[in-house]
Amino acid sequence: MALKIRLARGGSKKRPYYQIVVADARSPRDGRFLEKIGSWNPMLSKDDEKRIELNAERVSHWIAQGAQPTDRVLRFLDQAGLAKRPARSNPTKAVPGKKAQERAAEAKQKAEDAAAAAAESAAE
């Protein structure tokens, strides 16, 4: 049985509240789970201590049993110091595309031409 540590949504419309649960990966998001190990209330301010609550002992137990945390839960565990999130390395993501590079080169060329024309007219 593939176990996941994931979020199960509760609360009402426009007022989300999430339980951090251990569940079989095949069960529905808000369906059957094995154990509730914490909660997350995104409606509280970011510095509120009750925003994220985790039972560290049970989290460690389930990770030792082979449960895989989802991306969002892994962020919470990393903040709490219970698990390490791998560093993301995608250096090509910030590089502009071909068209953007061509437009930047054209704009640079126009600026150089304008500066040269201004210097030429000032010299006369």
UniProtKB/Swiss-Prot annotation:
Query: Which ranges are annotated Low complexity under compositional bias?
Result: 114-124
> One Pfam family this chain carries?
Ribosomal_S16
Instruction: Point to the regions of Basic and acidic residues compositional bias.
Output: 99-113
Q: Which keywords label this protein?
A: Ribonucleoprotein, Ribosomal protein
Q: Name one GO molecular function term.
A: structural constituent of ribosome
| GO BP terms in the entry | translation
Signal peptide span per the entry? none
Of the GO CC terms on this record, one is: small ribosomal subunit
Q: Where is this region: Disordered?
A: 82-124
UniProt-listed SUPFAM superfamilies: Ribosomal protein S16 (SSF54565)
**InterPro entries per the record?**
Ribosomal_bS16, Ribosomal_bS16_dom_sf
Q: Does the keyword Cytoplasm apply?
A: no
Q: Which PANTHER family match?
A: 30S RIBOSOMAL PROTEIN S16, SMALL RIBOSOMAL SUBUNIT PROTEIN BS16M
Enumerate the NCBIfam families for this protein: S16 (TIGR00002)
Q: Which family does the record assign?
A: Belongs to the bacterial ribosomal protein bS16 family.
* UniProt-listed HAMAP family: Ribosomal_bS16 (MF_00385)
Q: Quote the protein name from its UniProt record.
A: Small ribosomal subunit protein bS16
- Organism source for this protein? Sinorhizobium fredii (strain NBRC 101917 / NGR234)
